[in-house]
Amino acid sequence: MAMDSSLQARLFPGLAIKIQRSNGLIHSANVRTVNLEKSCVSVEWAEGGATKGKEIDFDDVAAINPELLQLLPLHPKDNLPLQENVTIQKQKRRSVNSKIPAPKESLRSRSTRMSTVSELRITAQENDMEVELPAAANSRKQFSVPPAPTRPSCPAVAEIPLRMVSEEMEEQVHSIRGSSSANPVNSVRRKSCLVKEVEKMKNKREEKKAQNSEMRMKRAQEYDSSFPNWEFARMIKEFRATLECHPLTMTDPIEEHRICVCVRKRPLNKQELAKKEIDVISIPSKCLLLVHEPKLKVDLTKYLENQAFCFDFAFDETASNEVVYRFTARPLVQTIFEGGKATCFAYGQTGSGKTHTMGGDLSGKAQNASKGIYAMASRDVFLLKNQPCYRKLGLEVYVTFFEIYNGKLFDLLNKKAKLRVLEDGKQQVQVVGLQEHLVNSADDVIKMIDMGSACRTSGQTFANSNSSRSHACFQIILRAKGRMHGKFSLVDLAGNERGADTSSADRQTRMEGAEINKSLLALKECIRALGQNKAHTPFRESKLTQVLRDSFIGENSRTCMIATISPGISSCEYTLNTLRYADRVKELSPHSGPSGEQLIQMETEEMEACSNGALIPGNLSKEEEELSSQMSSFNEAMTQIRELEEKAMEELKEIIQQGPDWLELSEMTEQPDYDLETFVNKAESALAQQAKHFSALRDVIKALRLAMQLEEQASRQISSKKRPQ
């Protein structure tokens, strides 16, 4: 502080001093202002035609401009040491012309020691350092003598300690000067206030980084970092800790709905556990489901997007088939005894548990049908049938079991015989050739289920090596004196994936996917029409809705949809598609109702998802318009293929039906006295008929070949457009 106060007296505006730039360059600058509070000066200089300036601490000024300190007077001492008195006397003697001889060597050494001590003080002030000189202090004690005149007769008494002090002081001065000259600025230079603030901020950032790193280390110890998504697992666990869970129980009341939409979550299977997948589905209450969708920000920061869905019932992974049946299909059994039509669907991704829910527990390819909704509904049907109020009706129980594959019907209880769907004059849909089997107990029903399930068509997809690629419909029909009293249709729908998700994307697979998605779209529209009491129900859009037409019309019709979902993180996209489909069927949402524009957008998204990726023309880009036109061509080709296939089958049947005529002609020739004229006439007539059918069959086959080529071309174009660049 003494140095600062002394230096302040030397600093004033306009003074030229030396400064050091941040790049190490030292040049001259003029003092502009002197700030006593901050102990700094503001300087300015001209550079490149412009005036620049900066602030410099007093210590930096002293370090770069030591000459300012050298000009300062020394502080007066009350008791001057011996060497200072000698120096003063020496100067006085030199100031007058005296004939006294020159001083001896002892006085010269004293003079040298005095200059050394003075330089040491100045150097210490220049460097703003406290220099401890224990040797000097001791030497002072050694040579402190009473102020008596020094006699030449005893020079050795003071000469020895003075020489020792002189040598020690010179060594300390040289060491201090050496260190100061080696690093004249950095050793004593203090930083400006701005630099100090920046360093404080930097230190805080480093401390925060260290704390975050320590927290990450602790979290990494709590979670197995070998998991590919352990960070998402931690975030999901922390989010679930904030939830209050009230799951569905068997004691909860059963609410009756005309359209009941439920969702069921299955547990992680062995394959998902082997891949160390995490569960991204939470069910905190009996009607609420949360999807923790993993996301990445632009800077690759991981976060969760929690999406909520509301349904009539939500079943977690601990719910058994009995619990699911109690709240879904069981209330519908009463409906068919009251003369109504009931339908229960299982909808979802391949491998999400549809067949397990409807058909029973699976062990490999073997299935325990007694644990499925099929068998449970059958048991309740026979229980109600034997009650006194319904026993007097004389009801009989029949069952049918068929599948819809690629738009064609096959009877699973009659060796997969092909069926035809026709509409009679009363606009009633009839399934020609479908056999109804009379059953007398639930055990008979289970046998029928086992027999039909063994014949069901399956295929391989990315999610399931034995995936059901057809819609299976098990119907329980009540008849009173041959007349239908009620019907309960239990449908296990095919997987809702697109054809591009299968292992082998050949034409057959594409046709499967297109037909499945088309029927699912038609089914959703029919259910929504039923819920909104619309006058028109679009049941003719697919074979599935045609067969179930009577379930969508009439006031005494009830429907239940069970949406099954997979909880793994790899199935998150398909799970969201399933939940959105089910949510739009019921039109239940935790948010406010959508506006008209949002409904149009929703319909457009549904058409895209359910038409094997078709795009609806509208506000689309050029590439999207091209893809939309190609998708439209693909759908037209698929529809044309199905129509031509039906025509080809009809022409072939007509040709086969002419077979007996040729056999009759052959038998005629076996007779010894057959009429040749009659033979020729019949042969010409048969040839004319056959030529007509063969010509028609040839035209149909040509058109079918062309349609297949168009479908192949459209499929390749769509694949090339969808392939990432």
Curated annotation (Swiss-Prot):
The modification N-acetylalanine is found at residue 2. Residues 618-658 form a coiled coil. A motif (Nuclear localization signal) lies at residues 415-418. SUPFAM superfamilies: P-loop containing nucleoside triphosphate hydrolases (SSF52540). Residues 89-116 are annotated as: Disordered. The modification Phosphoserine is found at residues 6, 22, 95, 106, 109, 111, 115, 166, 175, 187, 192, 519, 621, 633. GO terms for molecular function: ATP binding; ATP hydrolysis activity; centromeric DNA binding; microtubule binding; microtubule motor activity; microtubule plus-end binding. Its main location: cytoplasm. In complex with KIF18B, constitutes the major microtubule plus-end depolymerizing activity in mitotic cells. Regulates the turnover of microtubules at the kinetochore and functions in chromosome segregation during mitosis. Plays a role in chromosome congression and is required for the lateral to end-on conversion of the chromosome-microtubule attachment. This is Kinesin-like protein KIF2C. The gene is KIF2C.
